[in-house]
Amino acid sequence: TEVLPLASSRINTQTVEWNVDESLQSGKYTWIHMGGVEDPSAPHEFNLSDDLLKPGKGDNSKLPPLNLVVDAMYRITLEGTDLAGNTGKKFIMSVVYDDLAPQLELKYPLSNSAVNHLDISYSLNEQLSIGQIIYTRVGGEPDANSPVILDLTGAELETNFDTPQTTTKPPVLNDGSIYNIQFKGSDLATNESVSNIVENVKYDITRPVITIFYPSTKSYFMGSDIGIEISEDLKDGAMIWTRTGGLNDNVTRHSIPLYDQYLKQGRYEKAKTPIEKSLSAGVVYSLGVDARDFADNEAEPVLVEFIEFIRDMTGKWFYKGAIIEVVWVFEPDESGVKGKFMQGLSLGTKISDEERGTFTFDFNKKPYLLTVEMDDPSKNRISLVEFMSNNRIRVVTGQRKPASMGDGEVMEYEWRPE
């Protein structure tokens, strides 16, 4: 009576326990194959030694092991004959032998990654009685609840999570903490196992913030340097220039990527971007951001509006009159709005009658104001300027400031590459 293991159980040991109420003259126990994996050596029979024939509790722990087969199903028969020759039997039905630890593997997330969700992916090779995903904080923000233990339930203990998905009862992790993750479990025969450790996974559900402090709203912008501040390292990012007014632009939305050095957390007073190759002078844009961090959180929306782009004025600008062709040459300093000026007559590849001076642009007003101070003060000019396209300007000029674009002869200058 009182035998172990129990019927219909999975076991990881060959130990059989019993309780006998009288002395026996002989006894044996037998493992009879009933199903599962084939066992060509079955049945397995072992006679009890003399010290196991006494009344009371006994077990076979001191007897040699049998050559049982993993995942084979057996019926265990205990048989004993008392001193009067009476024979009794006890059957333990449907016992599955399994002394192998389950094979567990965590497949997702990946080590040294960042995630903004609680999806996991894992594999197991047999049904579990207990399964846990354990998150142990190893860096980042503190987590007073570490280690965080996720108990698997239902079908989660029986089948693989081949694709990343959220469990029935997701864990409560701390935003900004970095965890090592491990899968632990016990199968139905109580064999225990642990998986590989997924290291340094950052849980991050905070969206990055990118602040644009240059250019500002309702301003003009020239050059290629912008001023930005980034709250955290970015996986990728781009500045989005969208036409909202002014002259036409062949492309209404420009995505200008941020160079790698500007994807790091920090403040950048002069972040160089390839703007001048994309934007067009005289066009009014709004400036926003399209960026994401390493957990794929998209950046918080930001928009700077009513920015008028002014191209670099460096180079030669030609006005073709009825008889002659006039050329203006601008050599701006670092400000871009003032510098050296030269005008002359274009004769093929040469310039004659050169006159030199300095120039200053004021782009804060419309039309723009161009003041030229020549080495010969009698040649000083004040001009009103409008962009017609990226490479063409309309000019009205005089010794005094013209009242409007209609106050004098309108001349059209065209920029030509060297």
Model regions and ranges:
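Structural beta-strand segments of beta-rich domains
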Residues: 12-16, 116-120, 222-226
